[in-house]
Amino acid sequence: MENHTTPRTTWTPRIARRLEIVTTGGMDSILRIGAAMSADGYPVRDFTADVRDGVPYSSVTCTVSLTSAEAATFTERLGTLPAVISVEPC
């Protein structure tokens, strides 16, 4: 009988990182951030948006599971999105 499963050759641990992303542009920017994280394949455990009328800044608080290599480029990657002001651990 043949074994049809392929053993995993590499395994990279992921660490849950809680982040706050500050942005301008209201709900549209919040949705773009969520879409970008989804398109890049980041596992997002929770995603909370705080958008208030008349306030120039909005924020996303989220928990993202990242490898150490992904963590090194995550802030840079999100920083390329228009309207992202900062990405900080919380």
Q: Where do the language-model regions lie?
A:
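Long, contiguous binding/interaction regions
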Residues: M1-S58, T63-C90
